[in-house]
Amino acid sequence: MAASPTTGTDGRPPAPTGTASRRLALGALLFILVGWSLTGLDITVDRLLGAPGDAWDIFRRMFPPAFAEAAERGVVGKVFESVHIAWIGTLIGALLSLPLAFLAAGNVAPAWVRVPVRQLFNVIRAVPELILAMILIPVTGLGPWAGALAIGVHSIGTLGKWATEAIEGIDEGPLEAVAATGGRWASGMRWGVLPQILPVVTSQWLFRFEINVRASAVLGMIGAGGVGSELVSQLVFRNFPAVGAVLLMTIVVVLTIDTVSAAVRRRIIQGAGR
């Protein structure tokens, strides 16, 4: 029996024609783009080869960490200031994003409302927290309030998108039941949607808080409060033992928050599934 013209001699479909040439072209394009990027960043082979040794030298000079000096400079307070910035920023994002998410969901909001709100979320997410903080510092002045506002604004975009997706994935039975009894739109959101999404949204808020703790440490480098300012100060003076102490304190706090938050989120999701 003759082989089908659409299959190979072993019964499998033949490989698409031109696959090898396309892969070669993509590989060449990737190589060109990498080379172009390295050239644009003024990165040479010597610098690449020397980077691991330089990094190891700095890392080695951080030990033993100068915890006593860091404590005298109030680094512990700065670390917790970063946590406070992240918490207030997350709270701002959570409180403002949830109402907006109801206006952005395709199954509960009309298009003339939904489209602008979704675009607002996109615009907010497109601007990093660092840029937002630089914009806000002339308004609020240097300090943690600028960092908290920057994190809060950026969290609105991310949390709003996540909450919108949660609303669009609900079971619409309770919503239809509220409408059948003559309930208004707000009643449908309160009794038909909110109970379904609240566990998911709460876990999203906690996850965003974990992200914001790390972001708040970076914002301090431009004067927006937190431990980042202390880290920059020690790096400028090349006080590497103090840098090591600051980094280790920050890492311990961040890992602790991540572990506790992950456990709480797991309990919330498991409770919602029962």
Language-model regions: role of each:
Residues 88-121:
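Transmembrane-helix boundary motif in ABC transporter permease subunits
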Residues 1-91, 103, 107, 269-274:
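N-terminal, non-cleaved signal-anchor transmembrane helix
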Residues 121-155:
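Generic hydrophobic transmembrane alpha-helix motif, especially the helices
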Residues 203, 244-274:
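C-terminal transmembrane helix and the adjacent membrane-cytosol boundary/short C-terminal tail
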Residues 76-84, 117, 121-124, 206, ...:
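Alpha-helical membrane-interface segments at transmembrane helix boundaries
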